[in-house]
From Swiss-Prot:
It comes from the Eukaryota. Its main location: cytoplasm. O2 binds at H65. GO terms for molecular function: heme binding; metal ion binding; nitrite reductase activity; oxygen binding; oxygen carrier activity; peroxidase activity. This is Myoglobin. Keywords: Cytoplasm, Heme, Iron, Metal-binding, Muscle protein, Oxidoreductase, Oxygen transport, Phosphoprotein, Transport. Belongs to the globin family. Heme b binds at H94.
Length: 154
């Protein structure tokens, strides 16, 4: 389920918009994730105490983590599917240390798509959305395969 060169170009074009404000996009993605799927918040000791959207928006730690998440994802997307070296340590930490289920990767993928739709409607039409969905699915499938190798049934 690889992407065509044209699809990767659509993904990387919109990702260029994200890179203009990685921390802001990342914060918004995490807030959307936590609001839409409150159970995901339980995996983050640093953020468990944040109950309202205002508290989340005011949290520098949340913004920093959003920056970390989207910086890592951007590095993976830029590899256009050849992301083994980037994925291995990420899968290792998410499977063994953080115990993040694959389902939560689906949830954050949805949040990423929603944030891109709301922040960049002109650059994120149906074709770009389809391409990004495929790229995120490729990422999730490869993470799930690594999880399996590590014996994590997330």
């Amino acid at each position: 389920m690889g992407l065509s060169d044209g699809e990767w170009q659509l993904v990387l074009n919109v990702w260029g918009k994200v890179e203009a404000d990685v921390a802001g996009h990342g914060q918004e993605v995490l807030i959307r994730l936590f609001k839409g799927h409150p159970e995901t918040l339980e995996k983050f000791d640093k953020f468990k105490h944040l109950k309202s959207e205002d508290e989340m928006k005011a949290s520098e730690d949340l913004k920093k983590h959003g920056n970390t998440v989207l910086t890592a994802l951007g590095g993976i997307l830029k590899k256009k599917g050849h992301h083994e070296a980037e994925l291995t340590p990420l899968a290792q930490s998410h499977a063994t240390k953080h115990k993040i289920p694959v389902k939560y990767l689906e949830f954050i993928s949805e949040a990423i798509i929603q944030v891109l739709q709301s922040k960049h409607p002109g650059d994120f039409g149906a074709d770009a959305q389809g391409a990004m969905s495929k790229a995120l699915e490729l990422f999730r499938n490869d993470m799930a395969a690594k999880y399996k190798e590590l014996g994590f049934q997330g």
